[in-house]
Amino acid sequence: MINTIIIQKNLLLLFLLGVSLNSFGDINRYIRYTQNNLSSYGVIIDNKVHQLTKAPYLGGVKTGKTANLDKIILLAPAEPSKVIAVGYNYHSHRGDMELPAHPPIFLKLPTSIIATNESIIYPNGATDVHYEAELVVVMGKTASKVSKEDAENYIFGVTAGNDVSERNWQANDLQWFRGKAADTFAPLGPEIVTGLNYKDLLVQSRLNGKIMQSQRTQDHIHDIDAIVSHISQTVTLFPGDVIYTGTPGSTTAMVPGDIIEIEVEGVGILRNTISK
């Protein structure tokens, strides 16, 4: 019941604030949810969930069925074929390292994804698990070899993500895969929002209520259009694929019992508990 009340308050607040947000156009909020053991996509209108025929990034339309927010459980808002991430995309996180000509890219897995209110699980042998607050891009069209100038036309919307990372594995393994792609290491949500000006949104993390990271996406080293274009030169992006676009500042380890919140301006709060 507490989680349901939090969901209602967050979604209502976003609805009320929507008219004042810096946007590219009409702002729409899409979720994926379960009700009576059936999963669906939906759009939030007037504080009600309107069920869609399929994922909004696949052209889903309203079925005519609605649900109350207190009768649903939120799921991760996308079901991607690929979970791609960008490293060192803020000067505040990169420090004095030499700037790369292109965005450094790595992969997480669809099995890394969890929804808001689910638990981030420490893998066996993990000792130093960190949060990373990030804006996440959700693709809306198949993109292959697109230009930077055209990239925004392939983006459906944005959401919040946590690029959870095991720092010891990240530092000592030959590749980042184990330290980045473990189960539950890609919290995503709570919703996909279209129409936001993703080039200038505030990204924050809070650990047990304390602000740990806070910076705007306008400070990206490689902007989102450049990231989408660069990835699409070698990898075909499909609707629903997600791209974690980098984290600001420094991070610290999380321990079981901690609550980590990732908030992206206009998107809402992604909240997860740490568990063994």
Predicted regions and their residues:
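Catalytic-pocket segment enriched in acidic/His residues
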Residues: R167-K276
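Structural signature of FAD isoalloxazine-binding scaffolds in flavoprotein oxidoreductases
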Residues: L99-T116, Y131, E261-E265
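A generic local secondary-structure boundary/capping motif
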Residues: I73-L75, R94-D96, I120-V129, A143-D150, ...
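Residue-level recognition of short, solvent-exposed, well-ordered loop/turn junctions
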Residues: E79, A85, A115, H130-E132, ...
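Bacterial N-terminal signal peptides that target proteins for export
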Residues: M1-L12
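N-terminal non-catalytic cap/leader segment that marks the start of a structured domain
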Residues: G25-P103, L196, R206, K210, ...
